Every structure is written in C-alpha cells, then in structure tokens.
Swiss-Prot record:
Top-level taxon of origin: Eukaryota
InterPro entries: GPI_mannosylTrfase
Name listed for the protein in its UniProt record: GPI mannosyltransferase 4
Pfam families: Glyco_transf_22 (PF03901)
Known glycosylation sites: N429
Membrane topology recorded in Swiss-Prot or TrEMBL: Multi-pass membrane protein
Gene for this chain: SMP3
Keywords: Endoplasmic reticulum, Glycoprotein, Glycosyltransferase, GPI-anchor biosynthesis, Membrane, Transferase, Transmembrane, Transmembrane helix
Family affiliation: Belongs to the glycosyltransferase 22 family. PIGZ subfamily.
GO biological process: GPI anchor biosynthetic process
Record-listed E.C. numbers: 2.4.1.-
UniProt lineage: Eukaryota, Fungi, Dikarya, Ascomycota, Saccharomycotina
C-alpha cells in the first residue's frame, strides 16, 4: 500500500480516536476545560491549585485564545458536555494537522523529505491520543512548531537580505504566549533563538526591535488579563510564579519525583517508540527543530518531576528532523512496520481505552439527581462534565503521612463529589459510613481492576452494594499487580451503597 494512502487512513483514524472519551491525564481537564467552563458556563467544580489566587501559577490568556471562542459558541447554543468535549478535540486535531503541514513546508528541504516527514507526523499516535486533547502541553506544541518554523524562515531568507520585520513581530507574540502558557516553552526555544540571533538578529536590529516590542506588548496583555482573572490588587506574572514554585523540590515532591534520566530513558521511548531508530543515520544535520528537541529535553531533565506529556513538542520537532532517505544503519521497511505497529497499539491503549470509563460514568451520572459520589482509585473526575451550578467538590488531605477527610464537608449530602484518589479501604469505609449515616444517596465509582478490594466492603464492613452501571471499555494502568491477575481486568462500575 502506498505511503500516501496509509497516511490519510491514519489521519482519519486519529480524528475518530480524538472523539473517543479516553482520559490520558487529569491535567488535560483540570488545567484547561475545568476552569474555563466555570468562567463561561457559570458551573461549580474543581479549582486546581495552579488557578487558586495564592498560587496564580497558570495564565488564563492562552486558554481564552485557544478555547474561549469555541466555549463561548457552545454556551450560546447551550451545548452539552459531549458536544463541548468533541468540539475542543476536533479543534485541537485540525490545528495540529494543519500547522505541522505548514511547518514541514517551511523546514523540509526537498519534496521527498517533506513527504516523508508528513507521513511520520500523521501516523504517530500522539495526534489522536495527546495532541487533540486539551493539554497545555498540546498548546505548547503548536506554539513551538510555529515559532521554530518561522525562525527557520528568518534564518534562511536573512541570507538573501530580507528583514522580516512582520514575521519577527509574530515571533515576539508567539514566544510571549508560549511562556505564559508553560514556562518550559523557554527550554524549547532556547537554542533556536540563540542560533537565530547569531545568524540574523545581530545584524537586523529593526527586526529584533519588532520582536521585542511584540513580546513586551503580548506579555503586558497577558499580565493584565491574569490580574483581572485572579482578582488581586497586585500584578500577576504567572510564568514567574510557576517557575518559583517548580524550583522548590519540596513542591515537586507533592506531585512525584523521578530520576533525571526519566525523560530520556522512559518518556521519549513511550512517545516515539521505534521512531527513535530514525536517529540512527536518519539525521544528517543539526537542524533548528532538532536543536529545539535537544534544548527542551535538556532543560526539562533538570527538574525531577518528569511526565511524558512534557515532551509532546519533541514529537513533531524530532520527526521533522528525520531524513528517511539517508537511513542506512537499520532497515527502512522494518522500521516503518515497527513504527506503525507501535502506534497502532498505543492509539488503542492511550487514545481509546485509558481511563475512558471516568468520562463515560460522568455522562451516566449526569442523567439523574446527584447525591453523593465517591470516586475511588480512578483519575480525578473532571466535574465540569456534570454541568452542575451547585456542585461541591472535595478530596482527601494529609496530616504527615496520614491521609484523611478533614476537609470533606460531611453535612453536604446533595450535589457532592468526593475524590478519594487511591486511599486505603479503611478511609473509604469511614467516608461511606459517614454519608450513609446521614441518609445520603451514595454512588461509589471504582475500576473493576480493584473488584476484590471492593468486595471487602460487603464481606468485612457489611455494606450492601449494588452495581447500577458498568462499562467494559476502561483501562486502569495505575493499579496493575503482576501477583494479582484480577488487577488486569478492564472496566469501571458505578455502585449504589447502603
């Protein structure tokens, strides 16, 4: 089959996968849709720590630009959560596909290289499973690809005497917006900006002035928007707040610490798989996109909190740097087959099944009056899906190493969602007992991978649990236990507990 046909088939598959309710990571909702739905739809729900005024570690400006128009339109047409999620994911999909296509034209030196890069960019599982999801990392990827592509133009045309004042102004806007979206954006643009300055801007001061002016104007606008959004009397500079927070290792420890080699040895293989073999002979020059990859990975590896999604910009930038026509050290045909097999497997795991039942269960629970929902051993539920204007959301707290429910208002017996995260069964028993004693209608939502532990609620604690709903399409990869085969059971269930 011709590569062009395979490419278009994969693009169609990626679009369909983008519409699946898979749930890759809580931040795809908590750092974007959750807070914006509260702003635009007037809902009540989870307010992540980053968006609490005492931290003010995330900017609202990029969210208004990338999600605001779609969500305002959804509000005007009174769209439900399925339409809202689908609209945002379709938007993310088309932005990525169109932008990477343009970037390939700017970066690719020959028609064959552009065609091969377009094939790789279209067949990575990242398109449907990550890039179409509402991550701040997805926005970072779009901005990084756009900025690197324009820097390539500036450097290439600069040799012919072009000044590119307007493009420099656009670059200033993109760089500022990228920093306010994620402070890690500086890492991806570090080396490319140094090269661009040395090869172009040190001789074109007018263009450099345009870049700096647009950077300052955009930064000022973002600061103004955030200051209004957080309602503080002092100016809010979210990238600075975020950087200061992440430079404190005690803060990072609350989110999980990893060895500094995690990005290189774990996260890159997870995102690129056999695609890393393309580096063996398939990269003949240190291109600007490749410099961005090196710069980004090196910078992010300095911090001990390392997740695969932090490296999303590396995927398109690396694939744009590959010249498959020069691949000699490994078989091209075999490598491409491994590439397609890897991405086919990962798109099913991450794009279709991963934590999918959480969103499915929320849609189901939305159809009836909400009493008390207790979520146990799942990802944090994105409560915006419930579209509830009177919701109370609470979770556990720690006193030393002891996990407790001190901050859970036990007197709220309606419109209450409790995220117990991965707490022990004793705390689950205590929580259920408190609400049942108060006469609450209690729903317990748990993955089937912990069904044996769920059964202890009846055997050990005497609860009467009745399964009200079950979906089999749910992969829980967080509680796998090789000594317990039942932990590999797919599915998620909603129980009524009395």
């Amino acid at each position: 089959m011709r590569l062009a046909v395979i490419r278009y088939i994969w693009l169609l598959v990626a679009l369909l996968v983008a519409l699946e309710p898979a749930y890759v990571h809580p931040d795809e909702h908590m750092q974007s849709v959750e807070v914006m739905m509260q702003k635009i739809f007037g809902l009540r729900g989870t307010v992540p720590w980053e968006f609490q005024p005492e931290y003010a570690a995330r900017s609202f400006a990029p969210l208004w630009i990338f999600m605001g128009p779609a969500l305002v339109a959804a509000r005007l047409f009174n769209a439900g959560p399925r339409v809202v999620l689908g609209l945002l994911r379709i938007q993310g999909y088309f932005l990525y596909v169109s932008l990477t296509r343009v970037a390939v034209e700017l970066v690719g030196r020959t028609k064959l290289r552009r065609s091969m890069a377009a094939f790789l960019l279209s067949t990575t599982y990242v398109v449907g499973a990550f890039q179409s999801h509402t991550f701040s990392n997805s926005i970072e990827t779009l901005l990084a690809v756009a900025a690197v592509g324009l820097l390539e133009v500036v450097i290439a045309d600069g040799r012919a005497g072009h000044r590119h004042v307007r493009i420099s102004g656009v670059l200033g806007f993109l760089i500022a917006l990228g920093l306010f979206n994620r402070v890690t954006f500086a890492g991806y643009l570090g080396l490319p900006c140094i090269v661009a300055f040395w090869q172009f801007y040190r001789r074109q001061w007018r263009s450099l002035a345009a870049l700096l002016l647009c950077f300052l104007l955009t930064s000022g606008a973002c600061i103004w928007i955030d200051t209004l959004s957080y309602g503080t009397s002092e100016w809010v500079i979210t990238p600075l707040n975020n950087l200061l927070y992440n430079m404190d290792e005690e803060n990072l420890a609350q989110h999980g610490l990893h060895p500094r080699y995690t990005h290189i040895l774990v996260n890159l293989p997870m995102l690129l798989g056999p695609g890393l073999l393309f580096a063996l002979g398939g990269i003949q020059r240190l291109s600007l996109p490749l410099l961005s990859c090196v710069s980004g990975v090196a910078t992010l590896s300095l911090f001990k909190h390392q997740e695969a999604r932090f490296l999303l910009p590396v995927v398109p930038l690396f694939l744009m740097s590959v010249d498959l026509t020069k691949l000699r050290t490994v078989s091209l045909t075999l490598t491409l087959k491994l590439w397609l097999a890897f991405n086919g497997l990962m798109v099913v795991i991450m794009g279709v099944g991963h934590q999918r039942g959480v969103i499915t269960a929320l849609h189901q629970l939305r159809e009836e009056p909400i009493g008390v929902q207790v979520w146990w051993k799942t990802y944090s539920p994105p409560t915006w899906v419930l579209m509830n204007e009177a919701l109370t959301v609470s979770t556990t707290n720690f006193v030393g190493d002891d996990e407790r429910i001190d901050e859970v208002p036990l007197d709220v017996t309606r419109n209450h969602v409790i995220d117990l995260k991965g707490c022990n069964i004793e705390l689950l028993n205590h929580t259920l007992s408190q609400f049942i004693a108060a006469g609450s209608k209690v729903h317990l939502i748990v993955p089937d991978s912990v069904a044996k532990k769920t059964a202890l609620l009846t055997k050990r604690y005497g609860f009467d649990i009745h399964r009200e709903f079950r979906t089999l399409v749910h992969l829980d990869l967080d509680h796998l236990d090789w000594s317990e085969p039942s932990s590999f059971t797919p599915g998620l269930s909603i129980y009524t507990v009395t």
